Each structure stands twice: as C-alpha cells, then as structure tokens.
Amino acid sequence: VKVGINGFGRIGRXVFRA
C-alpha cells in the first residue's frame, strides 16, 4: 500500500484528505 499523497484515501490512507 502506498501511504502518501492520495487525497481520495483509496490507496492506504492518504495524507491529504480534502
């Protein structure tokens, strides 16, 4: 899983959740 800049939170968590 890639926990980085997703925004959507589909891959892992996502750091930036707008």
UniProtKB/Swiss-Prot annotation:
Q: What is its EC number?
A: 1.2.1.12
**Which residues are NAD(+)-binding?**
R10, I11
SUPFAM superfamilies associated with the record:
NAD(P)-binding Rossmann-fold domains
Q: Which residues form the signal peptide?
A: none
Q: Mention one GO biological process in which this protein takes part, according to its record.
A: glycolytic process
InterPro entries tied to this protein: NAD(P)-bd_dom_sf (IPR036291)
GO molecular function terms attached to this record: glyceraldehyde-3-phosphate dehydrogenase (NAD+) (phosphorylating) activity
Provide the reaction this enzyme catalyses: D-glyceraldehyde 3-phosphate + phosphate + NAD(+) = (2R)-3-phospho-glyceroyl phosphate + NADH + H(+)
Q: In which pathway does it act?
A: Carbohydrate degradation; glycolysis; pyruvate from D-glyceraldehyde 3-phosphate: step 1/5
> What are the annotated GO cellular component locations?
cytoplasm
- Is Repeat one of the keywords? no
Keyword field contains NAD: yes
Where does this one sit in the cell?
Cytoplasm
Complexes and interactors: Homotetramer.
Further comment found in the protein's record: On the 2D-gel the determined pI of this protein is: 7.0, its MW is: 37.5 kDa.
Q: Which family does it belong to?
A: Belongs to the glyceraldehyde-3-phosphate dehydrogenase family.
Please give the name of this protein: Glyceraldehyde-3-phosphate dehydrogenase
Q: Which organism is it from?
A: Naegleria fowleri (Brain eating amoeba)
